[in-house]
């Protein structure tokens, strides 16, 4: 199995020292030792629940948390909530696209860190990462057999280079 209790404990230890922790809801639940599986609430959580999870992750030692992938029933956006030490919680949302692609979480985190390292604020970095990932998913959907190929971001790399300009 991929997720062993030992791996989950090690993830929680690493998370405690994070400057910017970027879990999806499943990862956040695992780090917090909260139920997943049949008892898990899924991705349709309230603002208050997002704030509770962020506060709990900060209490474990993360400086900032970007809680990714909140998708509420009947809405056409996907939300990411951000909060942390000396950072009031805020939300950044993008259009929800009705398909999943491998690598979007890694791409999002890479873009977030690129923007932070280029001197952007956490707010601007979160917006950049969400927009870049969204746009890469649209580019990917134009390719044959795209759902089996993973996210194609290469045509958009100029946007990352522009962070330095």
Q: Where on the chain are the PLM-derived regions?
A:
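Conserved phosphate/ATP/ADP-binding segment of small-molecule kinases
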Residues: 2-89
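Hydrophobic residues in alpha-helical segments
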Residues: 32, 116-117, 137
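Glycine-rich beta-alpha junction loops
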Residues: 27, 69-73, 95-98, 130-134
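Short pre-catalytic strand/loop immediately N-terminal to key active-site residues, enriched for Gly-Thr
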Residues: 89-103
